[in-house]
Amino acid sequence: MTIKYFLCLILICVCTNSYGSALHTQLVDDLNHLASNALMGRKTATEGAANTRAYLHSRLSKFNLNVSEQTFTYKSGIFEHAQGINIIAAPTKSTQRKKIIITAHYDHLGKRGGKYYFGANDNATGVAALLYLASSLQNKEFPYELVFVLTDAEENGLHGSKHFAQTLNSNNVLMNINLDMLGVKKHKSRVYALTSYSLKQKLKPVFTALNNTKITIKPVYSSKQMNRLIKSQNIDWHKASDHYSFAQNNIPYVYFGMGHDPHHHTTKDTVQHIDIPKYVSTVLAIEGFIKQLAHHHYDDLNAET
């Protein structure tokens, strides 16, 4: 065990004790395991991916949800195809209520040049957050049906979310909430909510009602605005993660993320480079957003981006 890793463990223990709740402790435990050697970088169609799914099944099986797998194939070259597996956790009793699809991709880059790419921020943070939300919201009363989807093969083309979104009837889905890269260590205590432009006025009361003193949710409605706020390169944030697959199928979205990460797709994307207290506060802010949606009854939301 390296000194740096030992210090990281101490940091996690201190931070989780400050929050007290067993749910918050589990959130950090999940993050730590998802970005560990045991899951070998979580690359699609590898032993690491299989180990990840086994862990996710074991966690989701503890909740009041029906857990299933969705296998899909996609082109991985001119003449080759590959297979991915999404994990879907839905209420045990289906209703006629509109669905909110909460997504996070669990795949990453695996092993390259003899080194594992652990993908702590990308996207163990999103997956651990989804597990937390599935647990904390499972017995809450909502005017909508919450469905949790852990997508595969996002890194090489959003393939898992493309397949899943195409199976949906957009008339039955209120929105997608996508969680990707929630642990960027920055000085501002802010998480960005990149949102379909059509939701700007409709979700304004929700964002206004939020009152989280540790983390501010900043609504953003264009890639240009997002790039300006985070002082990043010219990234098309509307197409940067799984939320784009839903937009392509006429389903509006809110994408929660922290912006550009200097350790993105490097071996330095580890738990040691995540601000744990800020990450936990970010997940709690997102939880607050979803709970606030329960106070607003939307019959339909247009998916124009």
Regions found by a protein language model. Name each.
Residues 39-41, 60, 75-79, 93-96, ...:
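Solvent-exposed loop/turn segments at secondary-structure junctions
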